[in-house]
Amino acid sequence: WRVTLPNSLFGSFNPYSDLIRGDWFNPKDRPHHTGAVYLNGHWLIEAAKLDEVLKPAGDTGLWFGQVDNERTTIWAQFKGVNPNEQLVEINVRRTVFYPDQPGRNYITVRGFTMRHAATPWAPPTAEQIGLIGTHWSKGWIIENNVVSHSICSGIALGKHGDEFDNTSANTAEGYVKTIERAHAHAIPWSK
């Protein structure tokens, strides 16, 4: 099965060209993207190479994506089912609920079902973006929600973004410097 979509569907963020990367992430000699494909509420596994998806399907369905300047093409295996008669979904957004800037304090998010976000890797040394996240805000109440199918992070309460994101070289010193910068940030780390 294959679908080709215009890149305009994704706007300025295309999860099928967005690689998972960052401090303490080991890609194991293959690319991993923040995009995903779902069949009836379950995700398929990203294949490392297109040939893996073109082979007969095994027990676990696979998908693979390619992005050029105009189009995104996604191949997927749907063993034993016609995807045109099932619920097939893809990620198109990085987050579901995430403020556009830090300092959006005292927000309550209660009673929602939130799914399918193409979130980046969220080490303690980079801006932590989740399917739902506070973006360096305080006083939030996040309760009685269903949060699922986020590539890297479901709920993120952590770090603001800065030019030092993912530059710690996986060291304790880099981690400590991140904490020092958090205390010195324009919106300081406080209760």
Label each residue range with its predicted role.
Residues 1-136, 141, 148, 154-157, ...:
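Extracellular polysaccharide-degrading/modifying enzymes targeting complex plant/algal/animal polysaccharides
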